């Protein structure tokens, strides 16, 4: 998977696949997985960072789809760019 410069370079479906890859820990090494998590934190800019993946709130669906939904809602509420259309 090609990593992109910003979250607005991803369609929602592409970003969901990125999150699924993190959740499945598909990196060749633990360091590869850690790099993906750091990239997730950079792209999302969400204050909860990787806790969105590993320690979800009780009122949120604990799935890649739930993670993406929370990011999308938080970014919209905070005036940040959304996903690329397409």
UniProtKB/Swiss-Prot annotation:
Alphabetic keyword roster: Bacteriocin immunity, Plasmid
Keyword Electron transport recorded: no
GO biological process: bacteriocin immunity
Transmembrane segments: none
Keyword flag S-adenosyl-L-methionine: no
One MF annotation (Gene Ontology) recorded for this entry: toxic substance binding
Family: Belongs to the colicins ColE2/ColE8/ColE9 and pyocins S1/S2 family.
Function field: This protein is able to protect a cell, which harbors the plasmid ColE2 encoding colicin E2, against colicin E2.
Protein's recorded name: Colicin-E2 immunity protein
Source species: Escherichia coli
């Amino acid at each position: 998977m090609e990593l992109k410069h910003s979250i607005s370079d991803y369609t929602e479906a592409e970003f969901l696949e990125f999150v699924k890859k993190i959740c499945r820990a598909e990196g060749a090494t633990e360091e590869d997985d850690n790099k993906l998590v750091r990239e997730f934190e950079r792209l999302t800019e969400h204050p909860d960072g990787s806790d969105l993946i590993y320690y979800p709130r009780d009122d949120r669906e604990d799935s890649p789809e739930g993670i993406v939904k929370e990011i999308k809602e938080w970014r919209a509420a905070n005036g940040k760019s959304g996903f690329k259309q397409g």
